[in-house]
């Protein structure tokens, strides 16, 4: 290891953040050291601080022998997730599904606000740059899914895909794990709801259209901003806003129920775009819409604050003042029933604006409903063939 790339083990707390720009709150927390811009080009996070379960923090430092600028950029590596099950269960009372699939761990889209980032800490990796550059694929996901659907006693309900990490992130283009999963679900007549930020979803429009005709599929695409600069900064490797809107149009034209998700809504950053995003989505043929306020659990809070300081320092104080107004004076409140929409006058105003715009555009007049009536349990090895 070159001197410039030397690593130094530090007991927590982590290294203090770089000096704050004028006007930033004096209570800005201690954060990881920001990685040189050239090394993290095309990434969302500014740093790669250790996860919350690590006993020591490791940071690169320049000891004067070489320049940190000579260190290589963060490249994407892909490992294998050997999990023996692919369906994850949940009993959260404020979400509309009880099971989900995530074909990948980590997400190359690099959305700085992603609430799934803290899950990388379970792997001993950073929720920062590691989350978007050290990915894990579940190559056996389609086979595992078929096995779980075939299990005695399995009760079909809609499976949500993309609730944690995006199933159509860039590596899906070559891995095609998601397409394999859809093929299994189509054969079994099992309903699926997909959430993505990627226009790659239209690759599978053939399968989705056939499933939609049987009320087995619907797709939600998140559009966070129509401002290309803001979108590129917050979601560096996700599809551009125009491509997402075009994907919504293609899906809608194919008869696939579509939803636009205005998510996350960030006060003083993108909340002014709510009506314009809904207008554009309705023009693309979307019939349903939803929104979610910015969520900052665990390490996401500090990663978002770093990003905000680096990109919009003049808005930092205002953004967090409004966030706290909607979160009971805190940066985040994980209370069920409130974590998605927040509380207080600002949260109420955002909700009313969203509702008024949806009424004006005729959105959410009818909700698409998926069915389990077509479910046929996959045959397992050893199952007798039916004679009738």
Name the predicted role of every residue range.
Residues 184-190, 247-257, 326-329, 353-364:
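A structural motif corresponding to the C-terminal end of an alpha-helix
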Residues 242-249, 253, 263, 272-284:
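Internal, well-ordered alpha-helical scaffold/interface segments
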Residues 226-228, 235-237, 250-270, 293-296, ...:
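Conserved strand-turn element in the central/C-terminal portion of the radical SAM core barrel
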Residues 193, 259, 289-291:
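Short hydrophobic alpha-helical runs that function as membrane-insertion/retention elements
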Residues 213-216, 257, 283-287:
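Glycine-enriched alpha-helix->loop->beta-strand junction motifs that scaffold or abut catalytic
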Residues 66-105, 109-220, 224-232, 240-253:
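Conserved Radical SAM active-site core
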Residues 199-202, 266-275:
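Active-site glycine- and acidic-residue-rich loops that bind
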Residues 1-82, 88-89, 272-388:
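Auxiliary Fe-S-binding modules of radical SAM enzymes
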């Amino acid at each position: 290891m070159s001197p410039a790339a030397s690593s130094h083990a530090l007991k927590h707390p982590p290294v203090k953040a770089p000096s704050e720009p004028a006007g930033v709150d004096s209570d800005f927390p201690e954060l990881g050291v920001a990685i040189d811009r050239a090394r993290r080009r095309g990434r969302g996070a500014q740093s790669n601080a250790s996860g919350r379960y690590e006993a020591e923090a490791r940071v690169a430092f320049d000891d004067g022998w070489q320049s940190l600028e000579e260190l290589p950029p963060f490249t994407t590596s892909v490992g294998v997730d050997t999990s023996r099950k692919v369906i994850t269960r949940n009993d959260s009372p404020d979400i509309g599904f009880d099971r989900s699939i995530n074909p990948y761990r980590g997400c190359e889209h690099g959305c700085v606000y992603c609430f799934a980032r803290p899950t990388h800490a379970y792997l001993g990796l950073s929720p920062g740059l590691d989350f978007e550059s050290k990915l894990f694929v579940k190559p056996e996901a389609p086979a595992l899914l078929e096995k779980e659907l075939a299990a005695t006693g399995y009760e079909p309900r809609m499976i949500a895909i993309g609730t944690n990490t995006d199933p159509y992130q860039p590596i899906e283009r070559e891995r095609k794990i998601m397409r394999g999963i859809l093929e299994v679900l189509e054969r079994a007549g099992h309903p699926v709801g997909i959430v993505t930020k990627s226009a790659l979803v239209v690759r599978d429009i053939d399968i989705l259209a056939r499933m939609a005709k049987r009320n087995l599929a619907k797709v939600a695409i998140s559009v966070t901003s129509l401002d290309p600069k803001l979108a590129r900064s917050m979601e560096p490797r996700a599809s551009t806003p125009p491509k997402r809107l075009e994907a919504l149009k293609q899906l809608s034209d194919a008869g696939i129920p579509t939803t636009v998700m205005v998510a996350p809504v960030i006060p003083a950053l993108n909340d002014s775009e709510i009506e314009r995003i809904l207008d554009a989505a309705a023009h693309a043929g979307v019939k349903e819409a939803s929104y979610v306020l910015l969520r900052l659990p665990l390490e996401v809070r500090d990663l978002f604050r770093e990003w905000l300081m680096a990109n919009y320092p003049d808005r930092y104080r205002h953004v967090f003042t409004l966030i706290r107004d909607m979160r009971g004076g805190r940066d985040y409140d994980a209370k069920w029933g409130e974590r998605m929409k927040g509380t207080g006058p600002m949260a109420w105003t955002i909700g009313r604006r969203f509702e008024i715009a949806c009424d004006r555009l005729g959105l959410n007049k009818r909700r698409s409903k998926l069915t389990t009536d077509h479910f046929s349990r996959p045959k397992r090895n050893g199952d007798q063939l039916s004679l009738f």
